Swiss-Prot record:
This is Dihydroorotase. The lineage of its organism: Bacteria, Bacillati, Bacillota, Bacilli, Lactobacillales. The active site is at 303. It holds the Pfam family Amidohydro_1. Binds 2 Zn(2+) ions per subunit. It catalyses: (S)-dihydroorotate + H2O = N-carbamoyl-L-aspartate + H(+). Zn(2+) 1 binds at residues 58, 60, 150, 303. Its EC number is 3.5.2.3. Catalyzes the reversible cyclization of carbamoyl aspartate to dihydroorotate. GO terms for biological process: 'de novo' UMP biosynthetic process; purine nucleobase catabolic process. Belongs to the metallo-dependent hydrolases superfamily. DHOase family. Class I DHOase subfamily. One of its GO terms (molecular function) is allantoinase activity.
Length: 425
C-alpha cells in the first residue's frame, strides 16, 4: 500500500520544509520536494503542516473499571482526532495492573481495541494505594513501559526509596504524582485569596513542593530516572531546575491547562475548573512557561481525564477532579504560544512529540525521516474554528475551553502507515 502526501510543509530536523512524503506500508520511503509515483492514495495536503505524530505520555482511558467515563475505543478516537499517534495510559483503573497477568491482559486489550500506539504504565505499589511494591521486572516483561501511581503520591519516603532503587534496575522511568495527602486538607482548589472569597477549601502548595523536594533527594541518592507529572508551582520548577544542574536524572511535564488557566479565572464555584493539581497563581503559570522555554520542563502532557456529566455537575466541593485534553491540546498551544510568537511551531513539536518519545525511550515515535515508522499528523493552522462539545470524540466533555476559538485543527492522522483519522471536508 502506497500513500503519497503532496504539497506539505513538513516539520523535520527542527525546521519547516516544503516537500512531498511517500509512505509504503508502515514506513516513510521518500521525502523529496517533488515525488511522482503511482500510489493507491494521493492526498494533496494543500500546504498544511505535516509533523511527526504527537506523543502524550499521560492519559487516562478509564478502561477497565470506569468505561462510562472513557474506554480504549473512545479514548483512541479522541487521541487520533487530536493528532496523537502514541499515548501512555495511567494505571488508576480497576483492576490495577499490578501483576504480570493483569498487565498482559491490559496490553492485549489496548492493542486490539486501540487505533494508535498505546503504552501501559504499571503501578508502583499493589492496588496503587498500599505500601507494598510490585514486581517491577515481571511487569516490564509483561509490557509495562514505565511506572506510576498517578492519582496518588507515594506517601512514605522508604517506599519511594525502595521503588526508585528497584525501578532503576529495570531501566524504566518512575512518573510521580507529587502530593502529600496530609497537606491536602480536603481542598478543591488552590489555597489563597480566591478560595477564601469563594468559600472553598484550598490545597496548599506544600502538598506538591514538600513531596517533590523529598523525592528529588531520593532520586539524587539512587540515580533513578524520576519524572514529575503535571508540575503546577513556580517553586517546583525551581527545585527541578536546581536538581538538574546538580546532575539528578529528573524530567518533568506540564499540562496545557496549567499554562493557560489560573485561579484568578475562577470567578464562581465552577466544577469545570477543578483539577488536580489545582489551577495556581498567575505567577506560577508564568514560571511554568519559563521552565518550558528554558528546558527545565521537557514536554507537554495533557493529563486527559474524562468524566461523565454527572461527575462534573454541582459544586467543586463534590465534583471529580479532571479535564479532558487530547482534542484541545495542540490547537490551544498553537493559538496561545505559536501565534503570539512565544515559541516556534518547531519548539511545540519538540515538546509534544520528539522529546516525550526520547525521554520515555519510545523508539518508533517522534520521528520523521526516511525509514521511520509512518506515524504522521497533518494540521490546518490557517483557519480558525471553535471548540464545541458536540465535536468531541471522547466520552468526556469536561473542558473549560469549550467555546474558545483556536487554530490548529487536525486534518489527518496516520499510524504505522494507516490513516486512522481524516477530517471530512
Amino acid at each position: 500500500m502506497k500513500v503519497l502526501l503532496k504539497n506539505a510543509r513538513v516539520i523535520k530536523s527542527h525546521q519547516v520544509q516544503k516537500t512531498d512524503v511517500l509512505v509504503e506500508n508502515d514506513r516513510i520511503t521518500q521525502i523529496q520536494p517533488e515525488i511522482n509515483v503511482e500510489a493507491e492514495q494521493i492526498i494533496d495536503v494543500k500546504n498544511q503542516l505535516l509533523m511527526p505524530g504527537l506523543v502524550d505520555i499521560h492519559v487516562h482511558f478509564r478502561d477497565p473499571g470506569q468505561t462510562d467515563k472513557e474506554d480504549v475505543v473512545s479514548g483512541s478516537a479522541a487521541a487520533v482526532k487530536g493528532g496523537f499517534t502514541t499515548v501512555l495510559t495511567m494505571p488508576n483503573v480497576d483492576p490495577v495492573p499490578d501483576t504480570p497477568e493483569k498487565m498482559t491482559a491490559m496490553v492485549k486489550h489496548n492493542q486490539t481495541a486501540g487505533s494508535l500506539h498505546i503504552g501501559q504504565y504499571g503501578s508502583i505499589t499493589k492496588k496503587r494505594t498500599s505500601e507494598e511494591l510490585v514486581d517491577f521486572k515481571a511487569l516490564k516483561e509483561a509490557g509495562a513501559v514505565a511506572f506510576s501511581n498517578d492519582g496518588n503520591g507515594i506517601q512514605t519516603a522508604e517506599t519511594m526509596y525502595q521503588a526508585m532503587l528497584q525501578i532503576k534496575e529495570v531501566g524504566l522511568p518512575l512518573a510521580a504524582h507529587v502530593e502529600d495527602e496530609s497537606l491536602m486538607q480536603h481542598g478543591v482548589m488552590n489555597q489563597g485569596t480566591v478560595a477564601e472569597k469563594l468559600g472553598l477549601p484550598g490545597i496548599s502548595e506544600l502538598a506538591e513542593t514538600a513531596q517533590l523536594a523529598r523525592d528529588l533527594e531520593i532520586a539524587r541518592n539512587t540515580g533513578a530516572h524520576y519524572h514529575v507529572c503535571h508540575v503546577s508551582k513556580a517553586r517546583s520548577v525551581e527545585l527541578i531546575r536546581r536538581a538538574q544542574r546538580d546532575g539528578v536524572h529528573v524530567t518533568a511535564e506540564v499540562a496545557p491547562h496549567h499554562l493557560f488557566l489560573d485561579e484568578t479565572m475562577i470567578s464562581m464555584d465552577n466544577p469545570m475548573m477543578k483539577m488536580n493539581p489545582p489551577l495556581r497563581t498567575l505567577e506560577d503559570r508564568q514560571a511554568l512557561l519559563g521552565g518550558l522555554l528554558d528546558g527545565t520542563i521537557g514536554m507537554i502532557a495533557t493529563d486527559h481525564a474524562p468524566h461523565t456529566v454527572k461527575d462534573k455537575a454541582g459544586s467543586m466541593k463534590t465534583a471529580s477532579f479532571g479535564i479532558t485534553g487530547l482534542e484541545t491540546a495542540f490547537p490551544l498551544l498553537y493559538t496561545k504560544l505559536v501565534k503570539p510568537g512565544l515559541c516556534t511551531v518547531e519548539q511545540l513539536v519538540e515538546w509534544m512529540s520528539i522529546q516525550p518519545a526520547e525521554i520515555f525511550n519510545l523508539k518508533a515515535a517522534g520521528q520523521l525521516e526516511v525509514g521511520d515508522v509512518a506515524d504522521l499528523t497533518v494540521m490546518n493552522v490557517e483557519d480558525e474554528y471553535e471548540i464545541k462539545e458536540a465535536d468531541f470524540a471522547s466520552k468526556g466533555i469536561n473542558s473549560p475551553f469549550i467555546g474558545q476559538k483556536v487554530y490548529g485543527q487536525t486534518q489527518l492522522t496516520m499510524v504505522a502507515g494507516k490513516i486512522v483519522y481524516q477530517r471530512e471536508g
